[in-house]
Design a protein with these regions (language model features):
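Cystatin/cathelin-like cysteine-protease inhibitor module
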Residues: 20-125
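Sec-dependent bacterial lipoprotein signal peptides
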Residues: 1-19
């Protein structure tokens, strides 16, 4: 009886560890390289569209592509944007997947947007 319980426990542990291994391998097989210059132009154009649609945010600027410092999502790369909202400066984080903006939100401290360099949006980026 003890041998059967031990085998059941061993089988359950083996099956559960296999699931974790499978997902780790899948993530490492599909790397997400930093977007190239063509992809960055598409990304910056999309971010500019999004920031221009924000009624209360003016004079938006954008950072270069950087790592996802907060690691708050599966995306490896981010771009920060900042703009004036009344008397405040607001920061936003845009999460990138290839040449698309997968998601965005108001920046949090862990995004480290305040430490990035910003420049105005340019048509020739």
């Amino acid at each position: 009886m003890v041998a059967i319980r031990l085998l059941q426990l061993l089988l359950a542990a083996l099956l559960l560890s296999g699931c974790t291994f499978f997902f780790d391998v899948q993530d490492s097989v599909q790397p997400d390289p930093e977007p190239d210059s063509r992809q960055q132009k598409i990304i910056f154009d999309r971010i500019q569209q999004i920031t221009q649609s924000m009624k209360e945010v003016t004079r938006s600027e954008v950072s270069n592509v950087g790592p996802n410092e907060a690691r708050s999502g599966p995306e490896k790369w981010t771009v920060c944007s900042r703009g004036n909202s009344g008397n405040e400066v607001r920061y936003f984080t845009f999460f990138l997947k290839g040449e698309t903006v997968a998601n965005w939100r108001p920046a949090v401290i862990n995004d480290k947007c305040e430490t990035r360099s910003f420049s105005p949006f340019e048509r020739d980026r």
